[in-house]
Amino acid sequence: MLPESVFLLLISHFLRAVTQPPFETEGVKQKLFHFSGHIDDFIVSRDQQTIYVASLNRLTSLSISNFSIQHEVSLGPVQDSPWCSADGKSCLKDNRPFPTDVRTKILQILPTNQILQCGSVKLGSCSTFNSKLSLITESTIAVAANSPDASTVSKIIDNRLIVAASATKESPYRDPFPAVAIRNLPGLNVENAGDLEGEAAVFLRAAYKNAFKFLYTFTHQHFVFVVAMVTPRESRLPMTTRLIRFCRNDTKFESYSEIELQCRGEDNTNYPFLNAIIQSYDKLIASFSTSSTSPKSSICVFSMQKVKLTFWYNVDRCRSGTDSIRLPHIGRDTKCVNKAHIPLDEDSCELGVGGSIELVEMSTKDIMGKVTSLMAVDQKAIFAGTTTSQIVMFKWDEHHSNQLEEYGRKEVGDGRTGSEVSKMVKFGDFVIVQMPYGIILEELSTCSHHSSCTECLVSVDPLCQWCHPTQSCTTSARCTSPVTSQCPIVDGDPIPSIVSVNSSTPISFNIHHLPPPVGFTYRCQFGTSTSSIKANWTTTGVSCPSEIFTSPNTFEILLLTSISNNPISRHNFTVYDCSGYGTCSSCMSSEYNCAWCSGLHKCSNSCGALEKSKACVKIQPMRLPIAIGSQQEIVLEASNLDTLDRRHEHFCKVNEQVSLAKIASDSIRCGKIQLTLSNTTSANMVVPLSLITRDSVIDIANVSLYSCTNLASDCSSCLALSPSLSCGWCNRQCSHECHESKATAVCDPPRIDKFEPTSGPIEGGTIIKIYGNDLGMSVEDVRGKIYVAGSRCNIVEYHVSNMIACQVDKGVSSGPIRISVGRATVAVAESSELYSFVRTSIFSAYPLYGPISGGTRITLYGQNLSSGSQTSVTVGGMPCPIERVNSSTVLTCLTPSGTRIGKSARVVVHVDHSQTQLDQPFEYRSDPSISSIFPMTSFKAGGRIVYVQGNSLNTVQTAKLFLISSPTPPFYIISDLAPCHIINSTLMTCMTPKILETITRRVEYTRQPVGFHMDNVTAVANLGRRIQMGIYPNPTLSPFKGVRYHQGEQSLILEGHNLNLAAEPNDFKIFIGNERCYVTLVDVRQLVCSGPVRQPKATDERGIPINGDNPLVTVIVGSLRMELGLIEYSDHALPSRLSLLILGLLLFIVVTLTVMCLVFKRRRQEREKEYRKIQLQMENLENNVRKECKQAFAELQTNLVLSPKSANSVNLGPELINFPHFVENLLWSDNNLTSAPSLARTLPVTLAQFHALLSFKGFIFTIVEAAESDVSISTSEKSMLASLLISVLLRNFSYCTEVVVDLLRAHIARSVQNKRAELLFRNSDSVVEKMFSKWMSICLYSHLTPQMNSYFYLYKALQYQTDKGPVDAVTGDARYTINEAKLLRESVDTKTLKIRVIPFEKCDESIDLEVHACDAICQVKQKVASAVYRETPYSQRPRITQFELKYKCPKRGDVKLTDVLPIETLSQKKLPVKLFTLADYGISDGCTLEMSPAVYTAESYRNSLADSGQSSWSSLDRCSPIYSSSKYYHLTNPSSGTMTFKKKSSNDSNLLPKSIPEVYLTRLLTSKGTVETYVEDFLESVLYMHDSSYPPILKFFFDILDREASVNGVSENICQQWKANGYVLRVWANFVRNPQLVFDVPHSISMDANLSTVAQTMMDCFSFSEPVLGAHSPSSRLLFAKDVARLRPLSVDLFKRVKNSPPLGMDELRTELVNMANDVSTCKGSSLALSELLSWVRGNGIRISQLLSSNEQFSQQRLPQKLSQVLHVCLETDNHIYSTISDYE
């Protein structure tokens, strides 16, 4: 059996085809940049020079070359609230903006190379920046999620932005907000927004808004995909992963579809939680886990072809009428309709479904750790980032296209960057890694470590390719030429590889797979020369001319490329010189192409034809040797002697001795020469003999010499030499001079010096070797004459004179060895030492069992086991190779393999001819097997304890663990052998082995198969892929910097790297001195242990004392031992440092008291100075308050009536619009119906059929029911539907009235049934109530002339009162207003100016006009337009953007008046910027202004926009531009001194406000007193206080409510609430708040505030609950509290009067309806409305058809069939998913 060392050697060399370790990695350069705030996202610029990083409140650009900041801009914090508008001007009740951090949700590079950034503030709106991060535009459109924790994904495709965002706080300023949308760039509006036929967006229903979390979006072919995780509505159900798909050009989202992705394990375990996902070419790679906190991740690979087919299967099922659409969260969950007539393929964009067929894949790889990001590297590798600062690298399995094989890991970041790898982006040969607080640039591959093409191509790194021009291993991206997949193969040596000096011959290299030179050249370099020669490439290799060499040499010839110094091949190259051969024979017999030039008598490679010798004299070596010291003639045979010139004498020369040579025909006879050599100890040697003539050497031959003295040292050896040597023995030495006395020589007696062995078994058979002198001259001299202790010994080996080996026969005693030498004369030699015959025996053996495979080391105990010459052991008749013989009583052997388990085998010891059997047999048992190892991780240094489970483990006595290179042959050992401890048959513990440094080089991570050395059991020598151990980098701990101070009762925290990758807390042994510190926590970079409370002695872990008083901290993990440094306990150091501490404390107290005194003195001076300053400011505040109070008192006493001029302005009469215009405003003011694409595509006959269908009330009721029951329909859509129905029904007003009344009755009954009776007409969130309010407004319009007159006078009075004082052009705040929210709380100079205006239409006339010096230019232009076009209706007046004002300045000429400076100048100013006023231009009383037409240029266009957010000329046709309050102000500066709720800086110079806001509340009384009469008149007219008659339709409406209240059992109070809400809230409040419905007047922010107060007062008058008013009540309610209290009883009286009035007769009602029908007949747009209504019905056709079919009465009227017929006609011209309606029988 083989010993262990041989076993390891064989395994290490087993099939050595693999010549390198399976995984190699090289340290990579890393660039890192830290951020103070959390990083949200990053992108790389298109020029690959800059990284744009969005972090908390910042946007930064980094230079990739040096990772330094180029530009940076601050994004926040900003004043924001989700309950406020984007500009912060309006908020919901009790909400105010507050400082909010900005978290970037979208970061993209636009096609214009601008940066698009969308944050979590301002409703998720976006901004654009240029490359230097200067702000370009700000949008107010909500695009991203406006919550830090909500998800948003985006992608730019075809100049469009794909956005998927999770729902956040339900703010009315964001609703409706799409979950997935396509937005146009740069406007960011949703494509086809508002189109009734569909828009490029989907909206989640309220119940599902918080269910979707979007993770990733990508494109594949012509589809867009979005990946989302969906939380089920039922908590018991698991989360699901949904893959959303729609076509790139689908602007209506008809193709919107979803499928479920599932990743399952081998045991069918579902992994529902998606951690990361990436799409790469035709694969979708995703990482899943069982939960969000699971430490294990599983990777699944989905084929994009399977994804496409799964979508197709689901769509095809729905197309065939199977299943339902299954998209309830977006309002599409109706049953699928058979549409088999529609062609469908895998790329179809016509249908979209949710589907019930999911896509399931099995897990391809499991990772211990949570994967947070994925990145694909071409089609070769996948990188997975984890939460532990690691990047796990995978490559695609060569045999299974969807299988991943891990080939390495990288650790990135440091302690400051955080540990989660959030995002990875490939950047050339690098990867940019985003971590929570850092951006890292890391190398992708480890190719630079491989130096040869073969190593590169067999490397486990799939990114490594061999770049031929540079002769380096790199990635394909770095190589200028195509990388090669085959290494060049050099076929033999270059031709020629040998050249002569002074010659030049082209040298050819035969190389296979040598690519042609593209972008480089091949070059040849000879030896160490720095220059090279260009080589010519051919299909078979290259050739290059050689240099001309002047001296012989052997060197390397290198084949290089022109851009690399790494040789492609290297060969030995020889330059020879024939002239170095001095004789003709040596010249002619040389291995080079040399010839002998006889004429020149020299050797050359180029002799002339006549000079070249054809034959040379060749002396043959001498056959018989010559004795050294003899003198004799030497005869040598030779050939070609006839070529010699016999006219000259020839001589022989040996060792500088010369003798005359006689030349015969075939021999040379040299005269006698004395052959002597001094100081030689060699028995034989060779010396050269030269044949010379005339100082030239003809040839040289070797002559053999010998020395008899050195050939034999004793007499017998000398006489036994060959007679030809003529050696003889005399004078006690062997010499050729004794040849004559050889026959008479007498040798010394034979002598035995020693023999071995000295004992043997009595059975004989022992071979004894006897050493001595003169033991005969031949074997015959001693044959049969050797006796050992009296027993014959037969010769088996004989060496003349000095050694005899013989085999002894049986014997029983001890005695010497006798040898008789000689034949004629006998001499006897006898040994002085005795040989003993002994008896061998075996007593016992251990162990007596072992594995069937053999190899058990069995130890035998007995007697005389070391005797004899040959010892062997057999077990069961098979050899048991002896490992060692420890002594004569112990020997060890390795058992052979057995034939059957459980078989007993005899153990026999053979010593020569002796056989001894052991009494106990040896038992063969089952081979051990390994089932599992735990844990399966270790580090390079090894030494970690692992537990091995298996069967029959105790069959062997020892086991050793090692790692091998490959799970399949060929493989070799890559570690040392680690010992194991066998506990029982199923369990043993092993230490993990140390990885050999020569193998690993710098391995960071690898998984290696495991093997065990367990006797001869080969089944466990390689456990294959089943059990592989992960090898991690060694854990390292940072040494202490100096002495570490520690509190004894606290835990000791140690910092390091790779601590928990392959180690648990129990693997670490931490010693403080010689006492343990027990580990409680291990993190990847931190180790926490609990040690002794008191400081141990100053020793190491072994208790060996060290210098100093502090103990040493030592950490032992596995075979690693780390000394971190000394530690000192704080309480231990206290006594020695107490005195210094007290002294320092006293010094500190003295210094502190001194400083405090100085500071106190200075603070006191500052406080006195501050007090004087505040006192002065308080006096200014008192003066301002006093001034404001006096002015307010004066206004209260003097301004309570309108001036005559104002009265004229009021008495102009109401500017009522005509009835058709009123109806158009009423129906479409909130709903744009300017165009209808569907009308052009709809056939007239279809519209006629549809209109006929509307003549059935049941059909209209069904439409309303479908809308009311659909929770996904928004309020605006309901309003649009109500307007469409009213517009269509106005063709027949009587029928319209019947429909509205019937719907109202049903609605009242339903509200009462649902216990919502008191809410009727209050919220108006139903289609019925909206239809009623529009119908009621139309009916009352012609009867409201008195009320409209009062309302118009009130409007003019409010307008005059507001314009009498300054109005802020930005905020709308006015000095004179009745709305507290819009009260101007500033002291503004109200100087009135009288100016002259020259209109551009009447240049010779001027108009006098009163304005305020503080008026902005846009306000002046409004007043000018109102004065000049006083008698022109407002809608026909020119807009203020259509003319300009020029100031006729006598000194400066004409000065153009504008609100702001040009954009270029404005951008350099500090924001906010004040709007210019007349005072700023120096305009005073009597100045002249001239109107001129506006000239539109690019600059003026930008100026006119004035950062208003307006994007078209039409939007500028308002009464005034809308200026952003964040950038502009007029009268109220945001940082002004008025005491507001804004917190001021402590170092602000104006610590106190200029005034108190409450002081200005008296202006409300002034304004109220002025307009009070008009308000009362209007309210009384609404209450019909002065009229005895009422509109018939009002009586009709009230009677209906009374009847329905009686029928449904509703109380009188609730009925009166119905009347008040229906009459006031739904009709009059709408008129008051929107005067543009009835008057041709402009829109104004300040007027809107005033009218809101009037509307609130009117509603308070009709309120039936007594309000509780106090100091904290809104001022607007307190203003008219007395009037409300007076008028509230009159509202009740109004209802009673109407109720008690005579009932409305049918004739009177019919007349009223006929009159209304005549009025509405002039209205237009019903065809357009009919077409839009048809489009809506088509979109909800399935639901409507189902409702119609469920009603028996409607089915009898065949309404479902009629609807189906209409919609089928529509399908021929416009076919999409919402139109899939079939007949419902």
From Swiss-Prot:
Keyword Transit peptide among UniProt keywords: no
Ranges for domain PSI come to 446-488, 577-617, 707-748
Glycosylated residues: list them. Answer: 66, 249, 502, 536, 572, 679, 702, 864, 886, 984, 1016
One of its Pfam families is: TIG
Q: Which family does it belong to?
A: Belongs to the plexin family.
- Its biological function? Involved as a receptor for mab-20/sema-2a in the formation or stabilization of cell-cell contacts at several stages of epithelial morphogenesis. In early embryonic development, required for proper ventral closure of the epidermis. During male tail morphogenesis, involved in precursor cell sorting and in the formation of distinct sensory rays. Involved in axon guidance of SDQL neurons during neurogenesis. Probably in response to stimulation by mab-20, regulates fln-1-mediated remodeling of the actin cytoskeleton and thus axon guidance and/or fasciculation of DD/VD neurons.
Its protein name is: Plexin-2
Traced from the root, the source organism's taxonomic lineage reads:
Eukaryota, Metazoa, Ecdysozoa, Nematoda, Chromadorea
